Amino acid sequence: MHNKRIDASQLELKEQVVDIKRVTKVVKGGRNFRFSALVIVGDENGYVGVGSGKAMEIPDAIRKGIEDAKKNLIHVPIVGTTVPHETIGIFGAGNVLIMPAKEGTGIIAGGPVRTVLELAGFKDVRAKSLGTNNAKNMVNAAINGLSQLKRAEEVAKLRGKSVEELLG
């Protein structure tokens, strides 16, 4: 992942709440209830981030989640309307296989992974969720997979070759 932090105030970010759960802490006097929110933010132009927030009230949890997501933004390369190459993201028990698709295919992905890909700015991409359907693990696996993406120019530079040599 990139070391430099991305300034969220420069971007026009859209946010999407993926998951809200009521969580419980059992104490001597009974149970303490709080709400946990999983939020994805993105500018639909190559920037996407995920965050989680927890609070006594749902709106506060969502607000905290948005703040957290803005701190965890990553930049993803978009080639045309799709991903540059196939990749697998892993987080916990969640595996997400992200594959390029032809123009006009649309976003073929299930549940929270679809939201991540939409907010990242992809128009044509296929994804398969494997291992778990826990929203947090799926979203983080998708972010992990997207953070591994590299353009052909970057790969060529790392290998010390020209793009023509790389692509044959």
Swiss-Prot record:
It holds the Pfam family Ribosomal_S5_C. GO terms for molecular function: rRNA binding; structural constituent of ribosome. Gene3D superfamilies: 3.30.160.20, 3.30.230.10. GO terms for biological process: translation. Residues 13-76 form the S5 DRBM domain. InterPro entries: Ribosomal_Su5_D2-typ_SF (IPR020568), Ribosomal_uS5 (IPR000851), Ribosomal_uS5_bac-type (IPR005712), Ribosomal_uS5_C (IPR005324), Ribosomal_uS5_N (IPR013810), Ribosomal_uS5_N_CS (IPR018192), Ribsml_uS5_D2-typ_fold_subgr (IPR014721). Keywords: Ribonucleoprotein, Ribosomal protein, RNA-binding, rRNA-binding. The keyword Ribonucleoprotein applies. One of its GO terms (cellular component) is small ribosomal subunit. The N-terminal domain interacts with the head of the 30S subunit; the C-terminal domain interacts with the body and contacts protein S4. The interaction surface between S4 and S5 is involved in control of translational fidelity. Belongs to the universal ribosomal protein uS5 family. Part of the 30S ribosomal subunit. Contacts proteins S4 and S8. PANTHER family: MITOCHONDRIAL RIBOSOMAL PROTEIN S5. With S4 and S12 plays an important role in translational accuracy. Located at the back of the 30S subunit body where it stabilizes the conformation of the head with respect to the body. NCBIfam families: rpsE_bact. This is Small ribosomal subunit protein uS5. It comes from Alkaliphilus oremlandii (strain OhILAs) (Clostridium oremlandii (strain OhILAs)).
